[in-house]
Amino acid sequence: MKAVIQRVSEAGVKVDGRTVGAVERGILVLLGVEKGDSTKEADWLAEKIVNLRIFEDAAGKMNLSLLDIKGELLAVSQFTLAGNCSKGRRPSFDTAAPPEEAIQLYEYFVGKTWELGIPVQTGIFQADMKVSLVNDGPVTFILETPKNKERGTRS
């Protein structure tokens, strides 16, 4: 699994001009599921994201987690994170999980994040979505589960 996470002061996602998910202070997660991913990777990623200390404390130091600030999370599925652009001019999506597997792990990740105490809003899986955000910082990180690092997958 791969995720791009952004610290936001607000973020939202629309489908067909209608807002389907929106958060205020928190994290926007763009989540890509790859072949071979399992609930183990989803657990690792959810734990990492909710506990990652990327919010500033009173001294201005990144020392607080999403749990600490009682923030929200907007999860948006994005299969293009599994894209490989190393050859040619058209990305290959050979490593992306099939939709029927990806949706299960995406929904599992969302549920796990809820279990960890974070309110979650979502986009709609496989929909054409318009995502808007105000990146706070800007602060953006790319996370890969340990399994992806071991496989040596790179975009």
UniProtKB/Swiss-Prot annotation:
GO cellular component: cytoplasm
Keywords: Cytoplasm, Hydrolase, RNA-binding, tRNA-binding
Catalytic reaction equation(s): glycyl-tRNA(Ala) + H2O = tRNA(Ala) + glycine + H(+); a D-aminoacyl-tRNA + H2O = a tRNA + a D-alpha-amino acid + H(+)
Predominant location category: cytoplasm
Localisation: Cytoplasm
MF term (GO), any: Ser(Gly)-tRNA(Ala) hydrolase activity
Pfam family, one: Tyr_Deacylase
Keyword tRNA-binding part of the UniProt annotation: yes
Motif segment (Gly-cisPro motif, important for rejection of L-amino acids): 137-138
SUPFAM superfamilies noted in UniProt: DTD-like
CDD domains: Dtyr_deacylase
GO terms (BP aspect): D-amino acid catabolic process
EC number: 3.1.1.96
Description of how the protein assembles with itself and partners: Homodimer.
Function: An aminoacyl-tRNA editing enzyme that deacylates mischarged D-aminoacyl-tRNAs. Also deacylates mischarged glycyl-tRNA(Ala), protecting cells against glycine mischarging by AlaRS. Acts via tRNA-based rather than protein-based catalysis; rejects L-amino acids rather than detecting D-amino acids in the active site. By recycling D-aminoacyl-tRNA to D-amino acids and free tRNA molecules, this enzyme counteracts the toxicity associated with the formation of D-aminoacyl-tRNA entities in vivo and helps enforce protein L-homochirality.
Family membership: Belongs to the DTD family.
Entry note about domains: A Gly-cisPro motif from one monomer fits into the active site of the other monomer to allow specific chiral rejection of L-amino acids.
Name this protein carries in UniProt: D-aminoacyl-tRNA deacylase
Species per Swiss-Prot/TrEMBL record: Geotalea uraniireducens (strain Rf4)
